UniProtKB/Swiss-Prot annotation:
It is a multi-pass membrane protein. Glycans are attached at N61. Keywords: Ammonia transport, Cell membrane, Glycoprotein, Membrane, Transmembrane, Transmembrane helix, Transport. The gene is rhcg. Coiled coil: none annotated. The chain crosses the membrane at residues 23-43, 75-95, 100-120, 134-154, 167-187, 195-215, 235-255, 266-286, 298-318, 320-340, 359-379, 412-432. This is Ammonium transporter Rh type C. Belongs to the ammonium transporter (TC 2.A.49) family. Rh subfamily. Residues 44-74, 121-133, 188-194, 256-265, 319, 380-411 are extracellular. It comes from the Eukaryota. GO terms for cellular component: apical plasma membrane.
Amino acid sequence: MGNFIQGCKDYFSQQKNTNIRLTLPVVCFVWQIAMIILFGVFIRYDEESDTHWVETKAHDNITSDIENDFYFRYPSFQDVHVMIFVGFGFLMTFLKRYSFGAVGFNFLIASFGLQWALLMQGWFHSLDPQTGKIFIGVESLINADFCVAGCLIAYGAVLGKVSPVQLLVMTLFGVTLFAVEEYIILNLLHARDAGGSMVIHTFGGYYGLTISWVLYRPNLHQSKRMQGSVYHSDIFAMIGTLFLWMFWPSFNSAITDHGDGQHRAVINTYLCLASTVLTTVAISSFSQKTGKLDMVHIQNSTLAGGVALGTAAEFMISPYGALIVGFLCGIISTMGYIFISPFLEKTLKIQDTCGIHNLHAMPGVIGGIVGAITAAAASESVYGKHALINTFDFTGDFKDRTVLTQGGYQAAGMCVSIVFGVAGGAIVGSILKLPIWGDPADENCFDDEVYWELPDEEEEHQESIPPILEYNNHMIHKRQDLSESNFSVEHCES
């Protein structure tokens, strides 16, 4: 038995081989060919994107192409698409030597993930039982982007510590788990979650955190020199923040009902985000005796309000209610970066590179709670009888559901997303821990040179790069910053 255990230890601790010349091309080619075959078998245009749209218009007495769903949904789709590829990608460029990996691997897994998501979500939500086909339109593309967002959130927890092959495997399983938990929450429990506080952010957050916990690196301090930012990398990350911040109202309203529901979701998210910024700046400044702002907080915590309002965005939460949610999220998220992230790494052994627990996981749970309370408190006097039925879709098998029952199912949906994130992350993390994926050694983490060809001047002048801004580390704060903080370390540990 002892020899077996020692053999396992030796197997998992063998020297890292980061040469992915064979594995990455094989995985990309095989999976893309598989997508082509599966799309050929299952995927077809829906009636609004098919050439038979002309006949559909005549049959349904539609007089103008403007009634095609494309013209209603495409602006929101484009905003969401920019968030996925530009917003998430650039938000993760804060590391001084991992910008290629942040944007490039974000591009890679999003491009694969959206194809797999169209299939998985199609099989669960829109498979025609008569033809066995999946009919897709512009709303399908939005939902696929939403699915990919969960995987990109998870990527933030393991940024710089995994290989592109591991990321593709993580995305394959992540999209699959997402489709299942989304079906359970939205279809079986009939919870409402237009902006994905539960389905996207809570699941993606805990999925990534659990994978990071399984892949814990006790010697990650060997790459400490890379675990920080330089001035220009923070500016690039701030570009991602601004794109996400500007387009988050579209994210939360993209698949809501036509008319007042979408209008209300935009207003609520707009106000919530604005409130979050002021609170984040206040807490960031107050936490330091010098009153200086921490760029980590400004890049990330300012977005937490958009995450937290995702579930309740289309509800009658009222404008001042949206401001309250943003106010609370700014406090909780910023305090999370100051106290909870160091605790997670030191005590729970969770190395959260981008601090997704503070930007996605915690605000996602807050969003689930806000959604449950708001749903349970809904009334005909506020919504109107028909609007109440329309907002919560109390039709068909759910026509007799009360608002209190709906609130309970909203809370149940949040629990489902956490369970899927943690359980799925544990299983997938165990698979990714196998020493066959070409992941970097501890001393080479957070360095683009492992997987990317870098410009000659970068290689020649690597040693002359300005010192990193160590305070911009999403996992651990610099000791002197904590010692100069208005919040004591003793209070943090208590």
